Amino acid sequence: GFAAALQAAGLHALRFTFPYIEAGRRMPGPAAHALLTWRAVTAAARQRGNGPVVACGKSYGGRMASMAAAEEPGLDVAGLAYLGYPLHPPGKPEKPRIEHLPAVAQPQLFVEGTNDPFVQPLAQLEEAVASCQSARIAWIDGGGHSFEVKGRKQAPAEIGASLAPLVAEFVRGIA
């Protein structure tokens, strides 16, 4: 999967599960809890001393990392990579979740599927990324929110492994 492919590329990956998931809940609860989790995880990663720390999160995890980075004090990371950033709830582009993104000082990589309902219309994400200090998008042609492509049968681990080189290149570019 994704973490194994990062490790094969010479990067260290520290995986975690948010407490609400550990508790068996479907809904995340207060964002403050997720922000505290990100702070604890990045502190643990820094203690390992394996080079710069880059926060990488899927969907909600990425959005929470971006919110933690935008706060004062920001998240102590060299950069942030988002896999399927949830720009807005599906079908509700009038409710964007972007107001904090320009406050993120670190480089940001948005890995997004062109068929992801969380980023339609695509121009809305492009505008949000243009408002950021240092950010870019890596589009996955035909990819949905979990990067699945209609008509192409791929296991989640295979999809994750295919995304890792994009993130590895980003990390090497900021390290």
What are these regions (language model features)?
Residues G1, P121-L122:
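The serine-hydrolase catalytic nucleophile loop
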Residues G1-V53, F147-A155:
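Serine-hydrolase catalytic machinery in alpha/beta-hydrolase-like enzymes
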Residues L14, A130-E148:
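Catalytic histidine neighborhood in serine/cysteine hydrolases
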Residues W38-Q106:
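Primarily recognizes the serine-hydrolase "nucleophile elbow" in alpha/beta-hydrolase
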Residues V104, F110-E112, D116:
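Short beta-strand/loop motif that positions the catalytic acidic residue
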Residues N115-V119, H145-S146:
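Acidic catalytic loop of the alpha/beta-hydrolase fold
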Residues G143, G151-A175:
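Catalytic active-site module of serine/aspartate enzymes centered on a nucleophile-bearing elbow/loop
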